[in-house]
Amino acid sequence: VRFDDDAGLDTSEVQDLRGSGGGGGGIGGRVALGGGGLGVVGLIIYFVLSQLGGVSIGGGSGSALSGGLGSVGSGQQIDNSRLESECKTGADANKNHDCAIVAIVNSVQDYWKQQFARSGSTYRPAPTKFFNGGVRTGCGSATSDTGPFYCPADSDVYIDLSFFDELKTRFGARGGLFTEAYVLAHEYGHHVQNLLGTSRKGTGTGPTSGSVRLELQADCYAGVWANHASTTPTESGKPLITDVTQDDVASALDTASRIGDDYIQEKLGGGQVDRSKFTHGTSAQRKKWFTTGFQTGEPARCDTFGTSNLG
């Protein structure tokens, strides 16, 4: 994925909580934080750790990660000075990782602003917050082990960019910038669900649960954005992203295959797969729904709650 060198970046859509604004490195699903946070892999990781004698996970949306995390990182003060000075154009995004994340956030939100407008609604932007180590949110406290997540209580996306390194080393994903784009687009899919009132359906565990359907829909929404990424204009009238290659799509699908419930439970949980604990869907399902969104480019095709065939 590459960015138009001349396109402007909007750093106001990202808030840097990393203290002095230092650099980071870069996945997301459903995490049950104090107020019902939604992340790509967080709850799975904590389920696996609990099975291995690590943390204890409670039931429901109000108990899993809000307590017992020990001290979380400081740096709750927003300091965007570095982003503002370094991330001005697409040319900056092509050479600076933090700026690339800003560009991806801009592109995803530009798409949803325009999609909501086409349907006669108004999209309310949500900031992505960079943090290191730990963070306090409207959904409770979380550490970087949670993975990237969306908090409906404050309508923010949270990400410790170093988690993408763990995605490669611990989960075996191939990585790459479009992997990170897929994760961010997935989290913004949760924001869309929150705006549309769909988030409340994401309850329970198991292969056909509302939780799984919510996550697969967010994967599909990520695919929809990917379909439109190189054609969605910014305020200047030109798309921020110039192209999405087949290799980009392959990296997203590879990531989806590494964050399915079955893959993570088997890889990190000693080979045991408990379908009753599924919260995100299998690797095959996650690939299927991202592909559905990418191939159709239509949010309406992401109705995971209206189908008996999740894949």
Question: Which residues are covered by each model-predicted region?
Answer:
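Acidic helix-start/capping segments at beta-turn-to-alpha-helix junctions
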Residues: C87-D110, A117-G140, P239-D247
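Active-site recognition of the HExxH zinc-binding catalytic motif
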Residues: W112, I159, Y182-L195, D219, ...
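Short pre-active-site segment immediately N-terminal to the catalytic Zn-binding motif
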Residues: D165-Y182, G206-V212
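Pan-zinc metallopeptidase signature
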Residues: G260-G311
